[in-house]
Structures are given as structure tokens and as C-alpha cells.
Curated annotation (Swiss-Prot):
The PRC barrel domain binds ribosomal protein uS19. It comes from Legionella pneumophila subsp. pneumophila (strain Philadelphia 1 / ATCC 33152 / DSM 7513). One of its GO terms (molecular function) is ribosome binding. The gene is rimM. Its main location: cytoplasm. It holds the Pfam family PRC_RimM. Belongs to the RimM family. It is found in: Cytoplasm. One of its GO terms (cellular component) is cytoplasm. This is Ribosome maturation factor RimM. Keywords: Chaperone, Cytoplasm, Ribosome biogenesis, rRNA processing. It comes from the Bacteria. An accessory protein needed during the final step in the assembly of 30S ribosomal subunit, possibly for assembly of the head region. Essential for efficient processing of 16S rRNA. May be needed both before and after RbfA during the maturation of 16S rRNA. It has affinity for free ribosomal 30S subunits but not for 70S ribosomes. One of its GO terms (biological process) is ribosomal small subunit biogenesis.
Length: 169
């Protein structure tokens, strides 16, 4: 468990909440409360993934807060602030063919059908109606992630996404 392969970041710890050792959790899952499906949380600390035992986790109106074993006070739990929460990739639900988790698309090269290289996917933005690939290269491109419309193909083995998009957009 001491390397970063086969781990997926599902959230990040925020600031302490209150004085009894609770900490805010920023979920990267969609919807946000899907983070509750995973109970085998780990943090990358001292160059290795270390398990955490959740004592309590609550979804409040505007936040998710958790209490972690070994961190009973605000001063102690503040050490978790800004640490990523990871789970083993094997814990993720299987997807249908042609569906991808965001982490699988980030880092892929993006080209159009002419072979023009846009750059690499550095982020995926949710916009409500559809997700948008943020591609960094010589310039920044925002490409709607709409398979069959703008996304022609995702080649996992080559780590390339082919899009129907003009370089000048």
C-alpha cells in the first residue's frame, strides 16, 4: 500500500469543524454524498497510503463532516486538512462499456480527426447540462464531453481522446 497506483482520490479533507475532532470532507464524487458508499478511506501520508477508521460521518445541509479515530480534538484533526482521501480502484462500481470515471480521462491526450493535438485533459468541469474537458496545450481548450457528438472515441490503451472540434475554438 505504499505507492499511488491503483488508488482513486474520492475527496479531500477540509478544515476542522467544531472542537470535538470533526473535519469537513470535500467530496469529489457525483453526487457528493456518494462518498458515503466507501468506508475504507486512506490518506497519502509519509509517502504511503494509510488507512483511516471513520467513527462518524454526517451529511449536513451544506457540508459533509467526519470524525476519524485517533483525531479526537480540533488541534489533532487539523493535520488532515488538505489531505486527499483515496480508495482502492477495485472498490469502484463497474461501468458500462463507453463510460469512464473522470480520473481515467484526466491526463489523456486530445486530438481531432485531422490529427491536430490539443494537449492533455487536466480537469473536467461539471456544468449542469454536461461535463466539459479542460485541455491544456499551446492554448487552453474547453470541449464539451458529449460522446457521439463532440467526443468521437476514447482509446484507453493509447490514452487518446479523439474529438470533433476545431483547433480555433
Amino acid at each position: 500500500m505504499n505507492n499511488k497506483t491503483n488508488w482513486v482520490i474520492i475527496g479531500r479533507f477540509g478544515r476542522p469543524h467544531g472542537i470535538k475532532g470533526f473535519v469537513t470532507v470535500h467530496s469529489f464524487t457525483d453526487p457528493a454524498d456518494n462518498i458515503l458508499r466507501y468506508n475504507d478511506w486512506h490518506v497519502f501520508l509519509n509517502k504511503q497510503w494509510q488507512p483511516l477508521k471513520l467513527l462518524t460521518i454526517e451529511v449536513r445541509s451544506k457540508a459533509i463532516i467526519a470524525q476519524i479515530e485517533g483525531y479526537p480534538k480540533r488541534e489533532l484533526v487539523s493535520a488532515l486538512t488538505n489531505l486527499d482521501i483515496g480508495v482502492q480502484e477495485s472498490q469502484l462500481a463497474a461501468l458500462a462499456p463507453g463510460e469512464y470515471y473522470w480520473y481515467q480521462l484526466i491526463g489523456m491526450s486530445v486530438i481531432n480527426s485531422k490529427g491536430d493535438l490539443f494537449g492533455k485533459v487536466v480537469e473536467i468541469m461539471p456544468t449542469g447540462s454536461n461535463d466539459v474537458l479542460v485541455v491544456e496545450g499551446e492554448k487552453r481548450h474547453l470541449i464539451p464531453y458529449l460522446p457521439g457528438q463532440f467526443v468521437i472515441n476514447v482509446d484507453e490503451s493509447q490514452q487518446v481522446i479523439t474529438v470533433d472540434w476545431d483547433m480555433n475554438f
